[in-house]
Design a protein with these regions (language model features):
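Conserved beta/loop motifs at nucleotide-recognition and modification sites
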Residues: 1-230
């Protein structure tokens, strides 16, 4: 598996704090390779803000190809209907590749976000590349939270793997959970499918190495490692 660098987790910790307090902020930039965790947190935001019968009316999604300062301003100006907040989502729009005039307009909009708005930029198919030298980056820093969903540390992953198996009515010990992570990689996005597959296959309540070997799909790096280590 690729080596893990020390990712900046401050944004992720702030988002978790906001979700726990049921008090979402006004601006989030969600990016990073751990898409399972990103989508989980995005869904948590939606559940908090869009719960109730008028959720559809309070959710505004802007396709990247339609994005402009004017289009964004129109969405931000939509008042919530029978709710406290609205959620505006923009996916795969490269803010920092916009023209200078547009960047300045976005910065102004970010600085003046209404209290009822939660604006979320999701980076899925394109990377997020901020430029700290720009006014736009300053506006994002002052008004919002940039959340990098990086690969999780092994200790946290082991706990998560065990929780996911328990949700399926199964149990797996810590050492075997670590072996599963080594075998299938340390991305939750990949592991969740393997966990569900193994859980469905296993006959007993306790997951065994035989269960994993029978149905898990090892990542290529692990196969090569085993061949060279043989």
């Amino acid at each position: 598996m690729p080596p893990k660098g020390k990712a900046d987790t401050a944004g992720y910790q702030q988002l978790k704090k906001d979700l726990s307090a049921q008090a979402p902020g006004k601006l989030y930039i969600l990016h990073g390779e751990e898409t399972y965790l990103r989508d989980y947190c995005l869904n948590q935001l939606k559940e908090l803000i869009l719960s109730g019968g008028m959720g559809t009316f309070n959710f505004h999604e802007i396709p990247a190809k339609e994005m402009s300062p004017r289009r964004l301003e129109e969405a931000l100006d939509c008042l919530p209907m029978m709710a406290q907040r609205t959620l505006v989502q923009v996916t795969d729009f490269d803010l920092f590749k916009a023209g200078e005039k547009d960047r300045e307009a976005y910065a102004k909009l970010f600085e003046e976000l209404p209290d009822y708005v939660c604006l979320v930029f999701v980076y899925d198919l394109i990377p997020y590349k901020g430029d700290a030298r720009t006014k736009l980056a300053g506006a994002i820093k002052r008004s919002g939270v940039v959340v990098n969903f990086a690969r999780q540390e092994t200790g946290e992953l082991v706990k998560w793997v065990r929780r996911r198996f328990r949700a399926l009515g199964k149990d797996i010990d810590g050492n075997l959970a670590s072996e599963l992570i080594f075998l299938c990689g340390d991305l939750m996005t990949n592991l969740i499918g393997e966990i569900e597959k193994i859980g469905a296959y296993a006959k007993g309540a306790q997951i065994t190495r035989a269960d994993i070997d029978a149905v898990a799909t090892p990542q290529l790096d692990t196969v090569v490692f085993r061949m060279t280590d043989a």
